[in-house]
């Protein structure tokens, strides 16, 4: 990986990063969609043994290949995380029985559990309905919540967003995503790289709205990622959508999202990346982009990607 590194300085701090100009010619890089640039950076950083095949496919010179995507974090909702936590508890028991240190058994990458699937609406249209429903949920699922509380207190790299806080893809965008991730570099410095993630929720592509590459996976894939395994996908075909103008007054982001959904449902989009481009993107807020990206599962796309732009960076600041 060191062959692909370059460095930059921000406020006197030296940072390393993967320089794609060391992998592709300027013309090749210019033609490559931004979503594939992030995917390529991920392979160069995490799975360089697969880089020749991925580079060959990315430049149109090689056959289809598998991409061993390595997320730097993942998110679960409560219905898919409990089996993973039970496995970690079991592994810790076995390690302890064999005389090892059970506290050494932890998620390999940061994992966040969002509890948003268990609350049942029994009180509504009344003051205090939210609190009443949460109280019933805590009493009904007390054993499960005790187990989750143990996991949060015992496991490194594991955090819990409690019920009543927000749904998983909302919390991902508003509170968890970093857009640019910092990791330890081999020389003891700091390596900057794109925030890449997966989550066990079909609407995870909503995070693509702020330039974070991520998509939904099944529970078993999530558990494998929690153990440091890659999430393999076929090298994706990218479908571009050019936005040439701003929305007219009275036309909402929901109108745009439904129109895009109607258009793409007429085509085979399963397993493909959709990427937005064009001068009209500058007029779309991060919330509008999120509304569009959230609809990815409605037409089968893996990713609905919006490149990071100056306006969004100002919003993040």
Task: Describe these PLM feature segments.
Residues 1-317:
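Fe-S-dependent hydro-lyases/dehydratases of central metabolism
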């Amino acid at each position: 990986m060191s062959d692909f590194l370059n460095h930059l300085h921000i406020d006197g701090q030296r940072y390393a990063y993967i320089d794609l100009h060391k992998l592709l010619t300027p013309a090749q890089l210019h033609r490559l969609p931004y979503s594939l640039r992030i995917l390529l950076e991920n392979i160069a950083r995490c799975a360089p043994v697969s880089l020749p095949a991925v580079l060959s496919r990315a430049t149109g010179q090689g056959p289809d290949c598998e991409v061993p995507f390595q997320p730097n974090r993942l998110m679960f909702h409560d219905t898919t995380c409990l089996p993973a936590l039970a496995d970690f508890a079991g592994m810790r028991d076995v390690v302890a029985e064999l005389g090892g240190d059970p506290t050494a058994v932890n998620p390999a990458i940061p994992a966040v559990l969002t509890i948003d699937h268990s609350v049942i609406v029994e009180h509504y249209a009344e003051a205090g309905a939210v609190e009443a429903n949460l109280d019933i949920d805590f009493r009904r699922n007390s054993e499960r919540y005790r187990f989750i509380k143990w996991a949060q207190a015992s496991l490194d790299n594991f955090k819990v967003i409690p019920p009543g806080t927000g749904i998983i893809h909302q919390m991902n965008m508003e509170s968890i995503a970093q857009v640019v991730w910092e990791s330890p570099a081999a020389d003891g410095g700091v390596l900057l790289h794109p925030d890449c993630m997966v989550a066990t929720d079909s609407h995870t592509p909503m995070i693509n709205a702020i330039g974070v590459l991520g998509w939904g996976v099944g529970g078993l894939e999530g558990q494998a990622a929690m153990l440091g395994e890659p999430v393999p996908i076929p090298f994706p075909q990218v479908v571009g959508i050019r936005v040439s103008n701003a929305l007219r007054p009275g036309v909402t982001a929901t109108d745009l999202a439904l129109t895009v959904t109607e258009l793409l449902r007429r085509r085979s989009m399963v397993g493909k990346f959709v990427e937005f481009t064009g001068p009209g993107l500058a007029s779309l807020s991060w919330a509008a982009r999120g509304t569009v990206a959230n609809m990815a599962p409605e037409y089968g796309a893996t990713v609905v990607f919006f490149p990071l732009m100056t306006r969004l960076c100002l919003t993040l600041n």
